[in-house]
Amino acid sequence: MTNIVVLIKQVPDTWSERKLTDGDFTLDREAADAVLDEINERAVEEALQIREKEAADGIEGSVTVLTAGPERATEAIRKALSMGADKAVHLKDDGMHGSDVIQTGWALARALGTIEGTELVIAGNESTDGVGGAVPAIIAEYLGLPQLTHLRKVSIEGGKITGERETDEGVFTLEATLPAVISVNEKINEPRFPSFKGIMAAKKKEVTVLTLAEIGVESDEVGLANAGSTVLASTPKPAKTAGEKVTDEGEGGNQIVQYLVAQKII
């Protein structure tokens, strides 16, 4: 039996305009459309494929999704449940606002401790809002579990998990004994679309809501005021302007060189 927990995150849609709040420079999550991060959809898909493969062999398992976020994150949870996840855990506490990656990893590790029988934790390699790529490794460190990160292929057999990681140097095969933490990249699979039946079923699936107190995390261990880093200032990205057009009437090459020199590119 493989009981899998998938870490998911609701993020601003990459097609929406993303803004920082004026006061503390944290991401203004209400200013943009919110979606389940695409890499998390792939993580959920991988968990479902593992569960389905084992079910075909007569092995029972479950898939639980875990997220930390405000009330709005329920939308991401329902998307994962409609894909086929069995249940969800939602860490919802205002004290998490502004937490850095270390604090977030700590809180998620504590929340994982409330889910019994977890043998595998699957995460995306990095979120599209923070792009830190550190949370899976941080959680593995806190839990004292082996970690296999940035995987493009995964298989489980005999209480061991094997994965492939592709780098500029080549493709490496990694192996660990369960329980373990893994992260997957965009090459791992193509996520399924929720069916109408799945969408309706998701409304009835169990969602456990937890607070920081319920997972044994003190208020001074998380949050903006206790973060290990502070953003002191933020400057909006300049609006795009039309580029300089060069009409080649025999001097095009010289004009391009002059432009590059003026821009201190060459």
Curated annotation (Swiss-Prot):
Keyword set includes Flavoprotein: yes
Keywords: Electron transport, FAD, Flavoprotein, Transport
InterPro entries: ET-Flavoprotein_bsu_CS, ETF_a/b_N, ETF_b, ETF_beta_N, Rossmann-like_a/b/a_fold
Cofactor note: Binds 1 FAD per dimer. Binds 1 AMP per subunit.
UniProt cofactor(s): FAD; AMP
A Pfam family per the record: ETF
Keyword Ribonucleoprotein: no
Signal peptide segment: none
Domain of life where this protein originates: Bacteria
Record-linked PANTHER family: ELECTRON TRANSFER FLAVOPROTEIN BETA-SUBUNIT (PTHR21294), ELECTRON TRANSFER FLAVOPROTEIN SUBUNIT BETA (PTHR21294:SF8)
Assembly and interaction partners: Heterodimer of an alpha and a beta subunit.
Name of the molecule in the record: Electron transfer flavoprotein subunit beta
Organism: Mycobacterium tuberculosis (strain ATCC 25618 / H37Rv)
Primary gene name: etfB
